[in-house]
A protein has these predicted regions:
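A short acidic, Gly/Pro-enriched loop at the edge of an enzyme's catalytic core
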Residues: 101-109
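Conserved class I S-adenosyl-L-methionine
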Residues: 1-40, 54-58, 75-78, 82-85, 140-162, ...
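Class I SAM-dependent methyltransferase SAM/SAH-binding core
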Residues: 46, 52-99
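Conserved Class I S-adenosyl-L-methionine
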Residues: 52, 183, 187-259
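Short alpha-helix
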Residues: 169-183
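A short glycine-rich, Lys/Arg-flanked "PGG" loop and its adjoining helix->strand segment in the class I
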Residues: 123-135
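A short SAM/SAH-binding and catalytic strip from SAM-dependent methyltransferases
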Residues: 109-121
Length: 259
């Protein structure tokens, strides 16, 4: 509960910068995720950790209905404002996914985007979505991933936590697949994309533990697959990153998630 409260406060404060961030708002990336989801037309979707409604808007524009939930009241306010033109097909609530009323389920699909690296327990987070999806429904997890090498991943996570006190851990691509499988999903598919972060833009919308100069210094001391810093001639710093989208299908018959 304490972690969820910290997340709510952090994202209330960074909502405006988050909504404008190129990585979050890129229309082409959002469209690719909608296509990867491959949901049947007119599906009813749960957006877990919906933020300011960027992904919800993309699914709504594709003809689906979306119910979004987020811990941050400011994110929910922005999502409602952004998606108001879609009328009753769009609904949003402030709160924890784990407390989401099962009476409004089942959904045809559930999706989370850039959320798992803030989850205290990624498996429990995905299982909470699975519990609210109908048999044969779809669950999609999309997140920034890290290096399979433990030392490189540890360096990466140290940087992330220095820049954002709410960060827990980036999963590797394999771990992301494993979480969906352990949650009881089958036919799991994975697709990976490269993306870039500008260090200053990325740092400035975080909740840092260390100062910007110190985090920059630490960044220049290492590299990892999915998090590779590269100085630019203009004095800026680009981070070359990887994001993975994993898609699983809930079996039609009874299936128990594994622990």
């Amino acid at each position: 509960m304490a972690h969820e409260q910290e997340l709510a406060q952090a994202f209330d404060g960074q909502a405006e910068r988050f909504e404008q961030a190129p990585t979050q708002s890129d229309p082409a990336a959002l469209a690719r995720l909608v296509a990867f989801a491959a949901l049947v037309p007119g599906s009813r979707i749960l957006d877990a950790g919906c933020g300011p409604g960027l992904l919800a808007e993309a699914f709504l524009a594709a003809g689906h209905s979306v119910h979004g939930i987020d811990l941050s009241s400011e994110m929910v306010r922005r999502a409602r404002e952004r998606c108001a033109r879609f009328g009753e097909r769009a609904s949003f609530e402030e709160g924890s996914l784990f407390a989401l009323d099962l009476a409004i389920a089942p959904f045809d699909g559930a999706v989370s985007r850039f959320v798992i690296h803030h989850a205290s327990d990624p498996l429990a987070f995905v299982c909470a979505q699975v519990a609210r999806v109908r048999p044969a429904g779809i669950v999609i997890a999309y997140d920034h991933t890290t290096d399979p090498d433990p030392l490189a991943a540890a360096w990466h996570q140290g940087i992330e936590r220095a820049r954002d006190r709410t960060h827990t851990r980036n999963l590797t691509p394999g771990e992301l697949v494993d979480v969906l499988v352990k949650a009881g999903l089958g036919d799991v598919r994975l697709a990976e994309e490269r993306f870039e972060l500008d260090f200053d833009e990325w740092f400035d919308r975080g909740t840092p533990v260390l100062g910007k100069d110190e985090v920059r210094r630490l960044l220049l001391g290492g590299t990892a697959r999915g998090f590779a810093p590269s100085p630019r001639p203009d004095g800026g710093l680009t981070l070359y990153c990887c994001r993975d989208m994993a898609r699983g299908v809930l079996p039609s018959g009874p299936s128990a998630p594994s622990s």
